[in-house]
Amino acid sequence: MLERRRNFMVPTAPAEIRLDDDILFSDFMLKWLEVTKSSIQITTYASYQGMVERVIVPYFRKRGIKLVDLKATDLQDFYNKQLERVKANSVIHYHANIHKALKYAVKIDLIPTNPADKVERPKKNEFKGSYYSADEIHALTEIAEGTKLEIPVLLASFYGLRRSEVLGLKWDAIDFEANTLEIKHIVTQASIDGKKVLVQADRAKTKSSLRTLPLVPPIRDRLLMLKGQQETYRRLCGKSYNRDYLGYLCVDEIGNIIRPNYVSEQFPKLLEKNGLRPIRFHDLRHSCASLLLANGVPMKQIQEWLGHSDFSTTANIYAHLDYASKLSSAQAMLEGLGYGNTSA
């Protein structure tokens, strides 16, 4: 069976690279990248392409290692070398791509076993995001008022939305009668073949990310005002108004959509200009979770609010913040053991 598949050709892969005994591991990674392109989302492909073409291929091409000769020690040397320049989390992503590619090589009988199975994956770095207090959130929303970041900041702070979810919000997801806000569309940016591409997708990160949240009065009022402002701008600009993004909440005065990189670049500048503590835009999501925890909201409800795929994700990220519940548990133990209502 192995011999029969030696010259197996994948129609969607680069024609100049043949899958045979002489194929370099670096060339095989490029072949796999093309094969997998049609089965993954464009943003995922962009991530894969960056890692494969900029990091994995140059390293292994320089060493001239054939796919059939690749050993676990070769991969371990690669991981160790990368750990000198990037964090463990990046190397974990490299490993994931290499493992998937080699699994495919086993599947089509180019190699008998997957050498990546024998390599110790680096331990993931423990990340603890920064969090704003309620007072800091109030200050931030005030300074963002009237800027292009006002709506993104408001929605990310209150609902804990991801950047892609905020920018992907459309008016048809807002029900002003039922007072609900539906998270079902995203806008992201990807780099494909060296070009930045805006990706608009009618789906969120996972099935659990598709969620409906209550539209609270203060935000309802602000969105109604925004809707009126956009209609006015559209009338005033006439044909000059960009109609490519009609329906989106986060557009500027002439209809241009607010792009992900704009938010990431301008948000820290807004903080610095106004003397606020530096955090990432994504930390507004963490700030939302920390405020919910501080006000006694159970972790399970926070999971649903944030749209995490499983409870463990929420627990792993925010368990160290759940001090309020620990105090409640301590008080319950004091009372249970007959120590009275002593404050813990």
Language model: regions and residue ranges:
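DNA/chromatin major-groove-contacting recognition/catalytic segments
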Residues: 138-145, 192-199, 295, 316, ...
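N-terminal DNA-binding module of tyrosine recombinases/phage integrases
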Residues: 1-73, 226-245, 323, 344
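Short, basic (Lys/Arg/His-rich) helix/loop patches that form interaction surfaces
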Residues: 142, 146-149, 159, 213, ...
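C-terminal secondary-structure termini that scaffold catalytic or DNA-interacting sites
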Residues: 178, 189-210, 217-219, 225, ...
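N-terminal core-binding DNA-recognition domain of tyrosine site-specific recombinases/integrases
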Residues: 21, 33-110, 126, 257-262, ...
